[in-house]
Amino acid sequence: MFIHVGYYHLIFNCIIQLILGVLLEVVHKFWRVGIVYMFGVVGGALAHSVVDSHVALAGASGGVYSLIGAHIATVITNWDTMQKNWLDNPAHFFSSGVFRIIALLLFCVPDFGLSIHRRINHPEQPNGITPHLGGFIIGILIGIPVLRNLKVEKWEKICFWISLLAFIALIIIAVVYNVLCIRPKLCPNIYYSN
């Protein structure tokens, strides 16, 4: 979480953490956002250990992408509230769900693309890209139950339990996988150093 691959990676992570973190903290309080962020870091690292453990892991991308996923979760659960009169007033447009999703895509697609580019074009220094996906998925799954909702509807209560159970199941599966793959004979594709 404290080591990064180059200045671009460090600066991008800091900017996204500040922008998205502050926006989420204003509505949901710092401790809820902290929970999402830390679970995103852990979830990203677990995803990396399951899928791509032979590659170096650096940066806070799991946490950053969990904040992006948490914003998506907020947009999903508050869609009706955000879309109310969104075309009538420019201020409403900038707070609408459509604008937020487009803005998030403009932030994360170039960063994720650069990570894939670095992974493919620099095989001598491979870098993990699964923490991005793991953090994003964890951000959505934990964002729905942890972050506050403005107006709770019946489908959102169902979504709450589904996302919470999916989050718990993914964490348990990843931990069990890591525990069972301690011995090289169980996981022959993983490089073990002496």
Regions found by a protein language model. Give the residues of each.
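Transmembrane helix-loop-helix
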Residues: 1-71, 78
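Beta-strand segments within the central parallel beta-sheet cores of soluble alpha/beta enzyme folds
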Residues: 35-38, 84-88
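A sequence-composition feature that detects small, non-aromatic residues
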Residues: 45-47, 56-60, 70-73, 91, ...
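Interfacial segments of multi-pass membrane proteins
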Residues: 70-77, 142-146
